[in-house]
Amino acid sequence: MPQQNCTVILAAGEGKRMKRDLPKALLPVLFKPMLQWVLDAARAAGAGRACVVTGCRHEQVEAWLAEHDPEAETAYQPERLGTGHAVRMASEFIRAHAQGGSVLVLNGDAPFLGAAAIRGALRRHLRDGNAVTLISARLEDPTGYGRVLRSGPEGPVRAIVEQKDASPRELAVREVNSGAYWFRQEDLLQILPEIGNDNAQGEYYLTDAVQLLIRKGRRAGACPAENPDAVLGANDCAQLHRLNALARDAVLGALMRGGVDIPCA
């Protein structure tokens, strides 16, 4: 049987700071829900069938999918217990749709992670025989992001260190984790039950899956996206406004490069 790949999109977040009636993943960037941006990128990359993990206001997300993307499947996360727990809710989907292949995990509020970055990461994932390959970005100002620590300048990943836990030397690293990953299916299914919640929030984090695989001697890699905006998401209205501004500027820039005259005022 040929290898199959599949996609799991995390869209269970409450988005409390948005103070909107819609689930965060359905909030628009240039009149299109962020979730649609993510689904479109995964499909354009040829990443197989998609499962959207829902949670807060799941009925709204499920109704939107039924109308706009009925091919997507859903898995329900009844409690928001972290990204690792969310992926675990999609375990049956992963077993059924990534037989012998790889699983792409994406955040439902990251509209600028494009198909090219997804395809490039999969090529590196398969070429290097990685158990997991995270999609990273190199930022001028990496403040607030988890740093990607490598064994050598372009070597395998040895750790992901969150900002609050990083040493001064680690804080100087400009390569950051986008929160998007390709996992080998068998490794992901094996490691998900081993993720613990011994942390201040009592949650199960998908980044711990990467650390557990590394400790087991599996190879972890990272593939930097050419567009550093790939790491951007929206946790509040100001960040959502920034995403819309960036998307608008990209459209205007493309038009002007094509010869369209757009007045400055």
Predicted regions and their residues:
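Conserved N-terminal catalytic core of the sugar/cofactor nucleotidyltransferase
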Residues: 1-6, 33-116, 120-123
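Short beta-strand/turn micro-motifs composed of small residues
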Residues: 11, 54, 107, 136-137
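Short aromatic/basic micro-patch
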Residues: 28, 112, 182, 233-234
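Conserved core of the sugar-phosphate nucleotidyltransferase
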Residues: 113-200, 207
